[in-house]
Amino acid sequence: MKRFLIGAGVAAVILSGWFIADHQTHSQEMKVAEKMIG
């Protein structure tokens, strides 16, 4: 059970980091698009 919890914790950290990185790149693309349109 402990091993499962550790694995779940590691997976959660990796997923949250991936979501944050994906959101940051997306917001940067939106800023570039706004500059091009504006």
From Swiss-Prot:
Upregulating conditions: Part of the rapG-phrG operon. Transcription of phrG only is controlled by the sigma-H factor. Expression is rapidly induced in the transition state to stationary phase.
- Give yes or no: UniProt keyword Disulfide bond: no
- Where in the cell is the protein located? Secreted; Cytoplasm
* PTM (free text): Contains a predicted signal peptide cleavage site in the N-terminal region, however the propeptide is probably subject to only one processing event, at the N-terminal end of the mature peptide.
Q: Which UniProt keywords apply?
A: Cytoplasm, Secreted
Q: Name one GO cellular component term.
A: cytoplasm
Q: Does the keyword tRNA processing apply?
A: no
Propeptide stretch(es), residue numbers: 1-33
Phenotype of gene-disrupted mutants? Disruption of the gene results in the reduction of aprE expression.
Main role?
Signaling molecule involved in the regulation of expression of DegU-controlled genes. Secreted during production, but the mature peptide acts intracellularly, indicating that it needs to be imported into the cell to function. Stimulates the DegU-dependent expression of aprE, an extracellular alkaline protease. Acts by inhibiting RapG activity. At high concentrations, represses the DegS-dependent aprE expression.
Q: So what family is this one in?
A: Belongs to the Phr family.
What is this protein's name? RapG inhibitor
Write down the species. Bacillus subtilis (strain 168)
